[in-house]
Each structure stands twice: as C-alpha cells, then as structure tokens.
Amino acid sequence: MWFKNCLVYRFNRDIDFNADQLEKQLEEFRFTPCGSQDKQKFGWVNAMGRHGDMMTHVSENRILICAKKEEKMLPASVIKDSLNAKVETLEAESGTPLKKKEKDSLKEDIIIDLLPRAFSRSNFTYALIMPKEGFIVVDASSYKKAEDVLALLRKTMGSLPVVPAIPEQAIETTLTEWVKSGDTPKGITMLDEAELKSIQEDGGIVRVKKQELEADEIKNHIEANKVVTKLLINWQDRIEFILAEDGSIKRLKFSDELKDENDDIPREDQAARFDADFSLLCGEFSVFLPNLFESLGGLTQPNA
C-alpha cells in the first residue's frame, strides 16, 4: 500500500470527518459496472479491495478511500470508419449529400450499436484524508484525475472545501535557488535529475539525468534565464521523488529500510500487510508533507 504519486490538497476551512458517517455516504455512491449502453461508470469501491469489506480504511483518524472508473473503449478511428461507410451507402442510395445534423445522428446510432461490444478498461485511484494535518492526498498522475476523484467525494459528502496545496513562493523559484546555490534545507538532498525551462515563450527546455547539478553547465542554463521546473529530490534518506513546478510529487520511491519495517508480517497475509503498510505510509506522510512545504517557504494562507 504505497502511493506512487502525491497530489496534495489542503482544507481552506475546518471540517469534521467521521469515518462511520463517511462509510455510509460512500456506500450510496458505490461503483457499479457499465451497462450495455454506458460509456463510463465512476464510483467508490472497498479501500482494501478483495481483502476487506469496508469502503474506508482508517489508521489513527487518517482515512483511505478508493475510486474506480470503468470506461468503454471506442477508438475514434473505428467510429469514423463505420460512419464513413454508412454515409457513403446512404448518399449513393439517395444521390444527395447528407447534412451535418444527419451525420451527427448517424454517429450517435453507431456509438449505441458499438457500445455493447466494446472492451472496457478500469483504473483505481486512492485518496488519503488527513484531517489532523489538513490535507487530502490523491495518488494520481494528473490533476485532472485527482479533481475527478475530489468532485466525486464532494458529491458524496455534499461539501468539500479543498484547494491545491501551493507554497507562497513559486516552486520553480525555490528549486532554481537550490540548484543555483547548491544549498538546500535540512533533510532535502538534490539528486542527479532535473528539468530547466526558459522563461521566454519561445525558449527551450533542457532535461538532464545522471548529471551533477552543481556543474557549470547547469549554472550557465540558469544564467541564460532558465528556471528549474522539475527536480529529483531525496528526503531524509527515506523518500525519493520528482517535485514539479505545479506542486505535483511523482515517482515516489520509499526506502527499503522503511518498507522493511513490516517484514515480520507474512506477505501471504495480505490484509495485515496492507494495514501495516498503510500505517507506515500515514506516519511518513504526516512528517514528510509538512516538512516539504516548510522547506518550500510555507503554504499560501487559506481565505478567511
């Protein structure tokens, strides 16, 4: 139970979370599979999957939830080919070209016909609610996916006063200062990967890997009006990650030392292992996230 990504939102006003009440609310929006004419379905599933029967999983008042989305796969090329063939046939029969409205109607008919036979794909997105710390952390690779989950949670609860957790100072400004000076806050270590982007609209992008970031070449890029927009960071020898200018935390990699703390639990006992790993994750995030935002200069103040 280890997150791979971290998109962090903060509460902009106090809100009480009751796990029992949330359990009932989530149940009302439980995921149901796509029917023959559904293009997609989105809802909540058991937090521990087949290893549990609760919609939530709780550790010291921190709540894990999981959303599932199922989408029917209808490639645009398949729809286009079917539409073109149908239009060709009808126009040949009538001797007159079809109007746009008629083509649009045909397209809808084709989609309705194809949906029952379409393959579907599913994906799961976890969210960690941390009331004490004031965060909701979504394990998503894009803000669009995270916002979809939060929109569903907002619909489920009736209200969800959260905003992206954004530092007072622009992240790219802070990252650039770190790389330029070689000086980072305690516990933060720059590694050997970064992205630098020109501040000019038509400027270039430089991506470096396995390269010393204190090298003159990197400093020259900064002197040439490039800013650091992504940086590979190690936090206290426990977590490695890429921090981007938009606040996204990706490629999370937890240290073997941390993950080995639960090695006394047999891997065959997946429910117990899930629970123990989740407790470790919560404990780590409760220190890591506040410390990271402090290192970045502190978060913007919520609206009064």
From Swiss-Prot:
InterPro entries on file: RdgC
Keyword Heme: no
Keyword annotations of the record: Cytoplasm, DNA recombination
Superkingdom of source: Bacteria
GO MF, one annotated term: double-stranded DNA binding
Any one of the GO BP annotations: regulation of DNA recombination
Described function: May be involved in recombination.
Family, per entry: Belongs to the RdgC family.
The protein's name in its UniProt record: Recombination-associated protein RdgC
Organism in which the protein naturally occurs: Vibrio atlanticus (strain LGP32) (Vibrio splendidus (strain Mel32))
